């Protein structure tokens, strides 16, 4: 089972298209899956957009009316997947952004790497001419600090050059080990890049095998300041 986890806040403009693409992709790439969405107190039409998809695909929505932030939304999704799995060694969590910057077309290769034995596969965003200038500058700065000692020891992950992205697949037994070590303590309430680094480092420490996969992000549908 693959649990596709989407932390969501005010994604009404993109979440429907993303779910449609995920559903279409799994019709061709046959794997058992379930989409878990954490609706983090959205104020737009996110919840209404989700409703019809629950009738045509395996979709479960959690969340509430109080905003908890990205880090705690991811934490809640990981715990939900951990509670639902029956085979943690065989099952996996896929974390994606709900704003469509993470394309479903990369899912088959992520899954193949996982099925080949990787406990964690991190999607590393390819920076090219199509990447917006603010994102290119940020990516250059982030890669610079991962190479700079002593910052490398604080944010770096062996074999991963971009620990700041949110697109990854993780074996659920590894997620379970991380949650057990963390007990009831959730991810810190920090900004998205910091939360992604913290989670990637925690998972990498528990994983036996870590891989990275170059991916092309989509910036043409919705560009955020972050």
Residue ranges and their predicted role:
Residues 2, 33, 58-60:
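Short, conserved active-site loop motifs that form the nucleotide-linked donor/cofactor pocket
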Residues 39-48, 100:
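A conserved acidic beta->alpha catalytic loop
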Residues 11-26:
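Short, well-formed alpha-helical segments that are part of the catalytic scaffolds
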Residues 60-81, 90-92, 103-187, 220-226:
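Acceptor/aglycone-binding surface of glycosyltransferases and processive sugar-polymer synthases
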Residues 31-41, 62-64:
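Short beta-strand/loop segment that forms part of the nucleotide-sugar
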Residues 11-15, 42, 103:
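Donor nucleotide-sugar binding loop of glycosyltransferases
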Residues 1-2, 20, 28, 53, ...:
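Hydrophobic helical membrane-anchoring modules
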């Amino acid at each position: 089972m693959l649990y596709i986890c989407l932390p969501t806040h005010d994604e009404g403009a993109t979440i429907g298209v993303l779910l449609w693409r995920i559903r279409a992709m799994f019709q061709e790439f046959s794997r058992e899956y379930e989409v878990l969405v954490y609706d983090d107190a959205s104020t737009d039409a996110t919840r209404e957009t989700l409703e019809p998809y629950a009738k045509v695909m395996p979709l479960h929505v959690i969340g509430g009316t109080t905003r908890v932030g990205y880090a705690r939304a991811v934490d809640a999704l990981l715990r939900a997947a951990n509670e639902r799995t029956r085979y943690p060694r065989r099952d996996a969590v896929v974390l994606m952004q709900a704003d469509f910057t993470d394309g479903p077309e990369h899912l088959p290769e992520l899954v193949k790497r996982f099925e080949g034995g990787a406990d964690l596969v991190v999607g590393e965003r390819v920076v090219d001419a199509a990447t917006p200038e603010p994102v290119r500058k940020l990516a250059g700065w982030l890669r610079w600090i991962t190479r700079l000692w002593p910052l490398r020891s604080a944010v770096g992950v062996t074999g991963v050059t971009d620990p700041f992205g949110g697109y990854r697949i993780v074996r659920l037994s590894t997620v379970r080990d991380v949650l057990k070590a963390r007990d009831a303590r959730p991810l810190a309430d920090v900004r998205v890049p910091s939360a992604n680094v913290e989670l990637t480092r925690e998972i990498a420490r528990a994983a036996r095998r870590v891989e990275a996969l170059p991916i092309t992000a989509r910036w043409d549908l919705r560009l955020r300041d972050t």
